[in-house]
Structure formats: C-alpha cells, structure tokens
Amino acid sequence: MTDNAGAVQPPTRREEARWTRATLGRDGQPLDLLTARFDRHRYAPHAHDEFTIGVCVGGSEIIDYRGGHIRAVPGSIVVLAPGEIHTGGPAACDGYAYRALYAQPSLLTEAVVGPPPHFREPLLDDPALAAALRTAHTELSACPDPLEAESRFPWLLAALVRRHSTARPDRDEIPGAAGVAAVVRDRLAGELQAPPSLADLATDLGLSRYQLLRAFRTAEGIPPYAWLAQHRVQRARRLLESGLRPAEVAGLVGFADQAHLTRWFRRVLGVTPAAYRTSVLPGRQGAAPVLTAAQQRSRRAGAGRPRLPV
C-alpha cells in the first residue's frame, strides 16, 4: 500500500471483537457469544467460570493450556474447561479468527448421567460439528431469538459432550415421543408471541431439556424453533392476505421484526412477505406474479441489459 507520495504504508491491522448475549428461552440463562478477528492481539493468562467452546474460522492461533501448546486452524474445535488458566495469540503473521461461546457447566450435563464431562483432548477434529457450531453462532449472533437459541445450542453442546468427553451418554430413546411433541406444539402455537422456554416445558413433562429436544426431533424431524417458525409463517400468510403489511404482521405472529419475518418467509415459501402480499390481495388483477428468490435475483441481474431485436 502506498500514500500519495509513493511511500509504502504498513497494512491496516484488524483487531475486532464483538460480544452478543443470547438467552436460552424466555427468561432463561444467558449464553455469551464472541466473534473475534485479531492480527496481533495476545491474551493475558486468564480463566473463565464457563466452558469455552471455540471454532477457528481463519488464520491460526497458538493457545497455551495445561502446560502445552494447542494450534487451532480453520475447522478445529477448542474446548477449555472452567477455571483452567490459558492464553492465546497469533501463530503466524496472518492473525487468527474464531467464534466462541461461553457455556455454564450445567449446559453440558443435560445429555449425560454421572459426573460432569471431562475433555481429555482440548483440540477436536469434528468438521460436521464445527460447521454446525459456526452456523448457529453466526445466525444467533445476528438475531438472538430465545427459542431458537434454546433449541440449537443445548443440542449441539450435547453432541459435543457425547462424542468427545468421558461422560456416559443418557438414553437415546424417549418413550411417548409423539405425545411429547404434541404437547410442545400446542403450547408453542398457543403462546405465539412469547413462547414458553423448553426448560419449563421439559419440567412440566418430567423430562430434561435434552430429552424433550430428542423426543420432538424424533416425532417431527425438526427442532421446536423451526416448527414454530413455520407455524408463524403460515399465520403470517393469512394476515398478509387480509391486507396487513409485513411490518405489522411480524409482531403479531411473534417474529422479532420485519427482517426476521422475511428471513423465515423466504426460507419456507421462497418469496418475501411483501411480494406475497402484492400477489394475493383481492382485486389486484394483473399484479406481478410471485417470484422465487432465485427468479428475483435473475430479474435484477437482467435489468438494464439491452433487449435484442426480434
């Protein structure tokens, strides 16, 4: 890089960190999420009260832990136990980037029996789990919906513990899974704007939160937050057809805002709420047809191109 006089300037260093606090269900316990990108930053020796679960997403980091050195590279998972001193910094000149979550120990005991889990190896190679953790972290950092956070993070942490710790897994089969799912569906649909936490539902059913999640997934094939989002989309359709605007509809069906509604509406139906409303309102003969997201992108890409003579 050069300035106006032609002198070489050093590259801009990136030292970025952003904290997001998600809540696991309505009035539930907090779960802190860190998104970090550092070129030179080196942590002082420290410890956390929580388990630190990190996924490296760029560069490489050297972590001093338990008297040794861990080298985290993209796709690797690092698990640091509560109360254990560690530090970290760049392994090379390209810095390092990672996503981390800070989980109370109780969160990692829901899918096991006996003593709390112990991770003999702090550096884990599990590409599928790393990708799932990264995706959940990214999406919940952008829009920390309580039910979605409670549906996704305890499930992923259970997978982490069951695959990689010394703890003994709890039973997989949940008797009466269909009945459990029916109760959960009814409660979520009945309290659309402020759904109950899964922890409270599990207590009412005499289950752990992990057992409730497993039962629901067994019966429905999707987690509770995804079922509720689809139910909200169907309710939103009816309200849009009645003439209400997307911004009004979002709050009425329990989405955080119009952007949250739009994200799920497109996932389920392939179009935006505004486009759907335009197409289905009564008396709008000749209205533009509803286009899928791909068709909308194609039309925008083609706008402005000269038309060929016929």
Language model feature labels by segment:
Residues T87-A91, R163-H164, R217:
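Sigma70-family region 2
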Residues D186-G190, A194-A199, L207, T218-Q258, ...:
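Terminal helix-turn-helix DNA-binding modules in bacterial transcription factors
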Residues E16-P117:
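N-terminal regulatory/effector-sensing and dimerization cores
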Residues L201-R209, L213:
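Helix-turn-helix
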Residues V112-R171:
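Amphipathic alpha-helical segments enriched in hydrophobic/aromatic residues interleaved with Lys/Arg
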Residues A128-A142, V180-E191, R235, L239-S242:
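Solvent-exposed, amphipathic alpha-helical segments
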